[in-house]
Design a protein with these regions (language model features):
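Conserved beta-strand-loop surface patch within small alpha/beta domains used
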Residues: 1-93, 100-165
Length: 165
């Protein structure tokens, strides 16, 4: 099972079924999506990352103002977000994975952050050695001095080193 999962609302069997679905790339499997949602709600990003690595595919988790969780799966190198129907602005968090790769902001990611500057509070990319966070200072108060860019919309997003899982 998933380490330190005693407090999560899922059993070992549910985790194993989700892992099997991920390994078989059945990204619309109800057990996989339910487990991923539970992990996201619990802030267990290590579990979300493990499922992404097992599938060899990028995945995205979007959390809206009401804590609704929207999940998308993509290819090995990109995940396209579907419209979060019923979601409410602002979005609290956008998380996506770089399975088996470094946690960094790719050009696609920074384009997404720039476009989301008016509706997204925080973002995270899951990769190696752990999650890389960024906070949108135009929406959330931050005590931080480094930003992704010096000018333009990316000057609102903090530049932070990855942390360990």
């Amino acid at each position: 099972g998933l380490p330190d999962a005693e407090d999560l609302p899922m059993c070992d069997e549910g985790w194993e079924m989700a892992c099997q679905a991920a390994a078989e790339r059945r990204v619309d499997d109800v057990h996989l999506l339910q487990t991923q949602r539970q992990l996201a709600q619990a802030g267990r990003w290590d579990g979300v990352y493990i499922l992404s690595v097992m599938a060899g595919l990028e995945t995205s988790v979007l959390v809206d103002a009401d804590d609704q969780v929207f999940i998308d799966w993509g290819t090995a190198g990109q995940v396209t977000l579907q419209p979060p129907v019923g979601g409410r602005l602002p979005f609290k968090l956008w998380v996506h994975t770089h399975p088996r790769f470094a946690a960094y902001w790719s050009s696609t990611d920074t384009n997404s952050l720039a476009l989301g500057s008016g509706i997204l509070q925080t973002a995270m990319v899951l990769g190696q050695p752990g999650p890389k966070h960024s906070i949108n200072r135009s929406m959330v108060e931050v005590n931080h001095s480094e930003f992704i860019r010096e000018q333009g919309p990316l000057s609102q997003w903090t530049e932070e080193a990855p942390r360990y899982y």
